[in-house]
Regions:
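Nucleotide-state-sensitive switch-loop elements of NTP-binding domains
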Residues: 1-21, 25-28, 33-240
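C-terminal lobe/tail of nucleotide-utilizing enzymes
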Residues: 1-14, 211-226, 236-396
Length: 396
């Protein structure tokens, strides 16, 4: 049976975290929940909290009431909290990743010389990869996460990841970067022409690539990856450091879901994958759950004799409100519709509870908090709604 979570438990989890990575499938309210967790920490804890979104949909700005958001960190005005009816003890900041600008910074940092950095930045393939290749966003997300974590500028960083399995792409990005530098493809593209043996072995590859891509484009590819390989040491060392941060004791993970079929299935998958990667799972948050009191009251009402509420009840209510008196037939149709709707509410609540129980069981070994947020009609687009969402979290 669901009980109100001791707020100190939730705040203790936030207080003990330096990095909170929020995962979930699309459409479950993950971005808003990330903001709500950040706002909750900033409200009750004396902390500088940063909410960092790597979600390409870029919805966090609207939810936090900011005019613009990007690589630059923007502070959420304390007045926004005051208008939501709370006085924050800490501070809340928000930022989102500009993939191209972040890659440019990374190239300048890892290139052995400024001249090589400029050659990489000027390469046409570099521009195409950083602007269009989805996994370039994954890797740079981890770089940005690591930067803000290591800077020590914030006491807590809440990271809003892309939807569901894309979140795992982000978390696996450091390993993919390390594997890339060890890949056969990179060796083929960057092997010196003077190496006769290797050149003969790779000749079929280049003949096919030349026909498909054209000599000029192939030359551009070879130049880019040859230059990129000069930065191998810096990238590999950084990838190792990022992986270590993700497994630190003060790095926690939270999975957000709704209790519909597909999101609940994805949440089950995420829980399994996160635990198999030995990440610290701190919370499962079921969002937009039917209020238990509503389901209980509706269930109790359905146990009453249907005949106790007849057309006369509605006709009397209409007369008291000064409305035209409905016919007995109209009243029967309305009552039948209400009765079916009430049955649907109870049935939906039973299904939700079953799915929540299953997810709770999946969390039992990790000791993660299982939290719920009740269904709210309409979209949350301001700090008042964000603060209310964070404050409404309850446990089971």
């Amino acid at each position: 049976m669901k009980q109100q979570l001791d707020s100190s438990q939730l705040l203790a989890m936030l207080d003990s975290s330096k990095l909170l990575v929020v995962c979930g499938s699309g459409g479950v309210g993950k971005t808003t929940m990330s903001a709500a967790l950040g706002a909750l920490a900033a409200t009750h804890l004396h902390k500088k909290v940063l909410v960092l979104t790597v979600d390409p949909a870029r919805r966090l700005a609207d939810a936090l009431g900011l005019q613009a958001i990007g690589n630059a960190v923007v502070q959420v005005d304390a007045m926004a909290f005051n208008e939501a009816g709370v006085a924050p003890q800490g501070q809340l900041f928000a930022a989102m990743i500009d993939t191209k600008a972040s890659w440019d910074d990374l190239i300048h940092r890892h290139a052995p010389t400024p001249a090589i950095a400029q050659r990489v930045l000027a390469n046409a393939l570099y521009t195409n990869l950083t602007e269009r290749f989805v996994h370039s966003h994954d890797y740079i997300a981890m770089e940005r996460l690591y930067d803000v974590y290591q800077s020590g500028a914030y006491d807590l960083v809440v990271v809003d990841t892309p939807p569901s399995r894309n979140a795992l792409d982000v978390l696996d990005a450091p390993k993919r970067m390390r594997d890339f530098f060890n890949s056969r493809l990179l060796q083929l593209l960057t092997t010196p022409a003077q190496s006769r043996v290797v050149s003969l072995m790779s000749k079929p590859f280049f003949q096919v690539a030349d026909r498909i891509l054209g000599a000029r484009f192939l030359s551009s590819i070879t130049e880019f990856f040859t230059l990129f390989r000069t930065m191998e040491k810096g990238f590999v060392e950084r990838a190792n450091k990022v992986e270590n941060v993700l497994r630190n004791t003060d790095t926690k993970f939270a999975v957000v879901t709704t209790l519909e079929v597909a999101p609940a299935f994805e949440a089950e998958y995420l829980l399994t994958e996160l635990q198999s990667r030995s990440f610290s799972l701190a919370a499962l948050i079921a969002n937009r759950v039917l209020p238990l009191t509503l389901a209980n009251q509706t269930s109790a009402a359905l146990t009453n004799d249907r005949s106790l509420v007849g057309p006369e009840t509605l006709q009397t209510a209409a007369a008291a409100a000064g409305l035209p008196t409905p016919s007995a037939e109209q009243c029967e149709r309305v009552l039948a519709t209400l009765w079916r709707a009430a049955q649907d509410v109870v049935a939906a609540s039973v299904v939700e509870q079953s799915r929540l129980d299953k997810l709770s069981h999946s969390c039992s070994k990790s000791g993660a908090n299982v939290l719920t947020a009740q269904y709210v009609s309409g979209e949350i687009t301001d700090m008042k709604g964000i603060v209310a969402l964070g404050e409404s979290l309850s446990g089971i």
